[in-house]
Each structure stands twice: as C-alpha cells, then as structure tokens.
Amino acid sequence: MKRLNKLVLGIIFLFLVISITAGCGIGKEAKIKKSFEKTLSMYPIKNLEDLYEKRRLFVMTKFDKNDKGTWIIGSEMATQNKGEALKVKGMVLYMNRNTKTTKGYYYVNAIKNDKDGRPQENEKRYPVKMVDNKIIPTKEIKDKNIKKEIENFKFFVQYGNFKDLSKYKDGDISYNPEVPSYSAKYQLTNDDYNVKQLRKRYDIPTNKAPKLLLKGTGNLKGSSVGYKDIEFTFVEKKEENIYFSDGLIFKPSEDK
C-alpha cells in the first residue's frame, strides 16, 4: 500500500513539474508575442512617409527633448545554391522625423568562403533617397537591372501583415535574461499570407515552407534598449541557404 501511495505521489509530482514547465513556456511565448505586437501592429504601412508622423511606440533609450527620432527600415533576400556564393540583395532607409527627409542605400552582396574558410564579401552600395514615397537613386546607375530593382523595391513593412500572429502556436521559445535576448520560431505553411507575398515578389528556388523567427534583445516589456527582427528561413544547410529578413527600428537621430 505504501509503495502504491509513493507511486501515486511520484506521478502527481511529475505531472505538476510538466504542467509548471509547460505553463512557463506558454507564458514566455505570450510575452514575446506581446513585445512584438507594438511593432507588428503597424504593418502594413503602404506609404512610408506616414512614419514621419508616427512616434515611438515603446521606449528604447533616452531621447533629447528636441529630437523626434529616426526610423530605420531594412529588408533583404538571401539565396545560396549548394557550393555557390551567398547572394544578398536589400535596402536600408533612414527616415529622420526632425527634417522629414529619408536617405539610405540599396546593396548587392556575394559572400563566399576563401580557402581558409573565412567569409569574403563583395558588397556594392547604391545611395538612394525617398521623395513622395518613391525611392530614387542619388547617383547615376549604368546597370539597368539594378536601377529597375531599386525603382520597384518594396519593404516588407509595406505589404506584410501579422493580424494572425495570435494564431501561431507551439513555437520554439528561447529566452536569455542575462543578455537579455529572446526569440520565438514557428513553422509556417505556404498558405500563410506573408509567405505568399514573399513568393509573389521574389524568385524563391524551393517549395519548402519557411520557419518564421521573431527575435529581439532588451527587456520583454519593451522598456530598454534593443532591436526586433523578423526572419523567414526557407532553407538552412551547410553551403545552402534561403532566407528573408526584415527590421523596423526607432532610435535617436544623429543630427537633431
């Protein structure tokens, strides 16, 4: 009888441990989602100039009282076929809310390891500005393909939509309070709205559905310095990678 009681107590204890552990995981997942909601709720912003009127949604660091801040937007697509260089194309814009001016650059990069295994980059940048929600090169570009890519470029923030974020379940959750840093990874399907939008705009050489990674640093309450990035990973292997990354950051302006 005593053995039976001990066995029952052991099972109850094990059940409690599993329940508490699962509960902590769910709690962290909910907090990570909530920390991203303030940023992702802004998607999509079809007219980027609307960001001139948007104030910071969470405190990242102390701002000068005369500084309205600067938005930094970045989107890039990277593909690497087996045995080839990692080819990256993307754009970064700096939107100064004080001067209501936007400048940045479009970039093309090919990264390949040398004989010693060290990555060698070959990045080319093309300076741009934005006027009336249009991206315009600030220097002459002889390559017609690059010029067209710049003119047709759209940031993920302009077409992405995370209204179904709450429906993403059973994420792979990671949290390090020492840094602090956190992430949530979800397996998506090809029927996901954002996946369809990416396939519509990019030549993605795989039919595999991607994993969505939400990663950030700083306090989960969004009250400290940090960043938040979004990444869609279609393929992640040695010498073979396909991913899309996006970031929207608000920070103090360098020139007030």
UniProtKB/Swiss-Prot annotation:
Keyword Signal applies: yes
InterPro entries: Csa, Csa_sf
Predominant localisation class: membrane
Pfam family, one: DUF576
Keywords annotated in UniProt: Cell membrane, Lipoprotein, Membrane, Palmitate, Signal
Membrane topology: Lipid-anchor
Subcellular locations according to the entry: Cell membrane
Lipidated positions per record (S-diacylglycerol cysteine): 24
GO annotation, cellular component aspect: plasma membrane
Signal peptide: 1-23
Tagged with keyword Membrane: yes
Lipidation sites (N-palmitoyl cysteine): 24
Family: Belongs to the staphylococcal tandem lipoprotein family.
Name recorded for this polypeptide: Uncharacterized lipoprotein SACOL0081/SACOL0082
Organismal lineage: Bacteria, Bacillati, Bacillota, Bacilli, Bacillales
